[in-house]
A protein has these predicted regions:
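Hydrophobic residues in well-ordered beta-strands that form the structural core
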Residues: 5, 44, 69-71, 211
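Short glycine/proline- and charge-enriched loop/turn segments
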Residues: 39, 114-122, 230-234
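A contiguous active-site-proximal alpha/beta segment in oxidoreductase catalytic domains
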Residues: 26, 49-110
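Contiguous beta-strand/loop segments that form the cofactor/metal-binding neighborhood of enzyme cores
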Residues: 136-218
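Beta-loop-alpha module in the N-terminal Rossmann-like domain of NAD(P)-dependent dehydrogenases
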Residues: 2-61
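A short helix->loop->beta-strand "cap" motif at the edges of active sites that frequently abuts
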Residues: 38-40, 65-68, 178-179
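C-terminal helical cap and adjacent loop that interface with cofactors, partners, or active-site loops
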Residues: 222-242
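NAD(P)-dependent dehydrogenases' Rossmann-like dinucleotide-binding region
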Residues: 72-76, 91-112, 126-134, 146-158, ...
């Protein structure tokens, strides 16, 4: 695999069709636009941008160049329990999806973080940074195309030394095919054996599914714990083994 010491050589290389971007969030949009103008498709780590102005520029560039702009929402693409839940919903196990409740707690590990991590202008705020995962899953599971943010709030309740940092956020969403609530934070306690107890509850007209994606507080080992309840079943699945 060839290595490049500068961006210009990479963009000039005709053999490269796709560029992956994981720079500081505020810089990702400009890099994506530059790559698309150079004839490359792009995939970005989330968040793909930090402002609406950046998003509009990205959309205009993608339309002008015909190149693909995509974001790697790893919680949907790479977490087995999320795919397992989708398969159960497609099989009719909980009827029509009415609501998602997405929880995204994270461990801060404050002494390992670079300065930009605490600067709102650099990372886009907690709803942009973390809750983009939960918004993506809301859209995915409800199928909503037209969405309104009914209410959102953020706060800094535990990190007074970083006044441009948000350590808590929540969103209430209404879509044309469902409702959603999201809560994200940087409060994972040290005793938890991993970085966060991420959960997703999907409510349907005939049942519901709860995902405990990364840890089960009851004590089951591993990840991707799925609970299904409907009119005929009340069961647990280890989705990591499916």
């Amino acid at each position: 695999i060839p290595r490049f010491t500068n961006k210009e050589d990479l963009l000039k290389n005709k053999e490269i069709e796709l560029v992956l971007i994981a720079d500081i969030p505020v810089k990702r949009a400009a890099l994506a636009i530059e790559c698309m103008n150079a004839g490359k498709d792009v995939m970005l780590d989330k968040p793909g941008c930090t402002t609406l102005e950046q998003l509009k520029e990205i959309e205009n560039t993608a339309k002008k160049t015909g190149k693909i702009f995509s974001i790697d929402f790893s919680e949907r693409f790479e977490v087995p329990s999320v795919q397992a839940a989708y398969d159960l919903i497609q099989a009719g196990e909980i009827g029509d999806v009415v609501q998602t409740i997405g929880m995204g707690p994270h461990r801060l590990n404050i002494h390992t973080r670079p300065d930009w991590f605490f600067d709102y202008d650099q990372y886009g705020g907690i709803l942009c940074d973390i809750a983009s995962h939960q918004i993506d899953q809301f859209l995915f599971f409800t199928g909503s195309k037209n969405v309104e943010i009914i209410n959102s709030s953020t706060g800094n309740f535990s990190n007074p030394d970083h006044n441009k940092f948000e350590d808590f956020g929540e969103i209430l969403i209404h879509g044309d095919k469902g409702r959603g609530y999201i809560r994200v934070d940087w409060y994972t306690p040290d005793a938890l054996p991993n970085w966060g107890d991420g959960r997703l509850t999907i409510l349907g007209t005939k049942g519901y599914i709860e995902l405990r994606k990364y840890v089960d507080l009851v004590g089951r080992e591993g990840t991707d714990h799925l609970f299904l309840v409907n009119n005929k079943k009340y069961e647990y699945k280890n989705a990591s083994k499916e």
